[in-house]
Amino acid sequence: MARDKTRMKRKERKNIAAGVAHVNSSFNNTKILISDVQGNAISWSSAGTMGFKGSRKSTPYAAQMAAEDAAKKAQDHGMKTIEVEVQGPGSGRESALRALAAAGLNITSIRDVTPMAHNGCRPPKRRRV
C-alpha cells in the first residue's frame, strides 16, 4: 500500500534575514538560486524562466533580469544580506552581481567556486565557425 505523502506548503512565507546567492553562469544560460545559510532553497530564477530562448539566454541582460527576479522573491521572505557564490565561465556573472546589489540586497562577500580541473577530462574540440 502506498503511504500518503505529507506535503509542505509551497509559498509559505519564511522570515530569513541572511542567505547565500548561488550564481551559475554557463555559456548557454544563467541560473540564480538564493538559499538560506544551511542551503535550503528560498527562491530561484534563470534566464530561461524569464522568457529568453536560444542564444538570448546567455546574454548579460537575461542574467540581470533573472537576478532581479530571484532577489525580489527572496526579499518577500525577509532576506536582507547575502553572500554570493559565482560559478562558471558565462557572460552573465558580472551583470547578475550588479543586479543583486541594485535590488537592495546587502552583499557581504563574493566567492568564485568555479571547479578547476587539475588536468582532468579532455576538453571539447575547438569550434570552427
UniProtKB/Swiss-Prot annotation:
GO MF, one example: rRNA binding
Membrane keyword on record: no
InterPro entries: Ribosomal_uS11, Ribosomal_uS11_bac-type, Ribosomal_uS11_CS, Ribosomal_uS11_sf
Ribonucleoprotein among keywords: yes
GO cellular component, one term: ribosome
Subunit structure: Part of the 30S ribosomal subunit. Interacts with proteins S7 and S18. Binds to IF-3.
Family: Belongs to the universal ribosomal protein uS11 family.
Name of the protein: Small ribosomal subunit protein uS11
Phylogenetic placement of the source organism: Bacteria, Pseudomonadati, Pseudomonadota, Alphaproteobacteria, Rhodobacterales
GN (gene name): rpsK
